[in-house]
Regions:
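Extended recognition/assembly regions associated with phosphoester-bond processing machinery
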Residues: 1-211
Length: 211
């Protein structure tokens, strides 16, 4: 059968939810449900069909938004969030190759291309040297002779800020959430323009700053 590359983002472990412990707990629960599904530790409502799909996942790509550690966050909260992520990535990397991209809220440089997160954040997970990779944003890789190129979304968000692209421009074949239509429309335009970040460096920080 076919293989799947699983794309996921927005774990935002460490997010305080403006002091809302329930929101923080919900974020952790969602992340753990995802890990359990990918590693086969839990089943979904659809039963065998979903389990079969999970078994076909050959790589997980975490497209940014892994952490949301505020500058004014206390040490205990930050340390706890990093430990949670380390455990989560250890579970994933023990079952399937994982690429962790940097993103907008992650502790790395903000200009594109963003450098990989430092291995010191994930001492246990990075022991899986063959399956746990901390990678740049944008990130390109190949699976079974199929090439992938992706970002953590800053380029798409910036295009939407400074263009008239909106949900009505999305393809009629798009069957996803209506809230994602404008982003999908902007993403498809970057393919037509053959430019990953057309608004850089004017409104999206990048390096080098000029040709």
């Amino acid at each position: 059968g076919g293989k799947y590359v699983c794309l996921v983002s927005g774990f935002e472990i460490g997010k305080d939810g403006d002091g809302d412990d329930d929101e923080s707990a919900a974020a952790r629960a969602r992340a753990q449900m995802f890990v359990d599904y990918v590693t086969g530790a839990s089943t979904m409502d659809d039963g065998e069909a979903c389990d079969s799909d999970a078994a076909k996942i050959c790589r997980v790509v975490v497209a940014g938004g892994t952490m949301d550690l505020k500058a004014n966050g206390n040490e205990e909260t930050t340390s706890g969030a990093l430990k949670e992520l380390d455990v989560m990535f250890t579970e994933l990397a023990s079952a399937v190759p994982v690429d962790v991209m940097s993103g907008q809220t992650d502790p790395t440089n903000k200009a594109m291309p963003q450098q990989p997160l430092h291995p010191v954040y994930f001492p246990e997970a990075t022991r899986f040297e063959q399956t746990m990779r901390l990678v740049t944003n944008p990130h390109d890789f190949t699976v079974d002779h199929t090439s992938f190129l992706g970002t953590s979304g800053q380029n798409v968000q910036d295009v939407l800020k400074f263009s008239t692209i909106d949900a009505k421009d999305a393809s009629d074949t798009f069957a996803g959430d209506d809230a994602a239509k404008s982003s999908v429309a902007a993403l498809s335009q970057t393919l037509r323009w053959q430019h990953v970040a057309p608004s850089a460096p004017d409104t999206l920080a990048c390096y080098p700053f000029k040709d």
